[in-house]
Amino acid sequence: MSGMQISSYLRKYLADEDKKIREEFKESDPNNEMILWMHEKTRITEEDLARPYTEDEVRELCLRTKVKVNMTAWNCLWEAKKRFDAKGRFERKSEEFINLMYLKAVRRKMVQPYPEDYVAQRREIAAAETKKDNISRLDRWQKQKRRNQSAHATQPDSQDNEVVEIHDDTNRYSVSQAVALPVLTPSDLSGIGDDEDEQQQQHHHHKHRSGFQNEHADCPETQMRCDQADSGRLPNGPTNSESDPDYYMFGTQLSRSIQPTSTQEADDQLACPETEMNESWVRCDQINSESMSIGPSINSDGSISFQNSGSEPIDVDVN
């Protein structure tokens, strides 16, 4: 795309603008140094206007730049509208009335249309400013592209170096493990741990059984059941799973209607020393057997009695 042809009016306009800025901001003043530097970077030159666009630049500008059309520039009707809006003449009015007011403003010369030469000159200045802005955009985008390409070019090298370092560390770690760990042949591993588990299980079973027998050695019932379990013979009839001696040791009275029945209950209680009642307790005529109850008792009809629930057990020493 060819460059923009600069006219004599535009050349004179740019020269006048540059002269006006330099007269207002003197170079002798150090405070104006930044303003003059910005003016030098942003002012429109003939080289900028003569620079042609490539096809890629035109495509990039069309895709990345928003097109805006200013319909109010050099429009006399817009100026008339601003005057009527300031007076409130268009409030709650129809479109026909508004158009008639525009015609009235032009006929009475409230506003005058801009000359075509003036509009063409203003458009030429706006086109020069737009091209300067587009050149600045293209230069900025080009710098960003080069910066991104250099960043992508250096990033794979650093990643390759990190991968090589990790690979070297892994190799050194594997080599150190291979040197530290001894190599065992299948012949060395044979026989290791074969009989240890069986011996430990047998020892644990024997220890558990001997401990259980020692704890219940005093009770003939437990001894009989242990002997039957060892010999593989268990009684066919129902057995009392609850520990009956515990209830008699703590003085808890159970009704005969709810006590568990067993065929071996009488023999077990007579044979076990813990369930035998001392004869000295029977000879004591002054002791009430009901006062020995610590907690609530159950009557024969199934009701719960709280009689003497707060009494404490009395120990009588006959000897």
UniProtKB/Swiss-Prot annotation:
GO cellular component: chromosome, centromeric region; nucleus; telomere cap complex
Protein location: Nucleus; Chromosome, Telomere
Keyword Transmembrane: no
Stretch list, region Disordered: 141-163, 186-248, 291-319
Biased composition range(s): Polar residues: 291-311
Region listing for Required for binding to Su(var)205, in residue ranges: 107-312
One of the protein's GO biological processes: telomere capping
Cysteine pairs bridged by disulfides in the record: none
Motif (Su(var)205-binding Pro-containing repeat 2): 273-279
Major location (coarse): nucleus
Entry keywords, A to Z: Chromosome, DNA-binding, Nucleus, Repeat, Telomere
Cited function: Binds to chromosome ends in a sequence-dependent manner and is required for telomere capping.
Complex and partners: Interacts (via C-terminus) with Su(var)205 dimer (via hinge and chromoshadow domain) and with moi to form the terminin, telomere-capping, complex. Interacts with HP6, which is also part of the terminin complex.
Note: Multiple telomeric associations (TAs) in the same metaphase spread often result in multicentric linear chromosomes that resemble little 'trains' of chromosomes, hence the name 'caravaggio', an Italian train.
This protein's name: Telomere-binding protein cav
Organism of derivation: Drosophila yakuba (Fruit fly)
Gene: cav
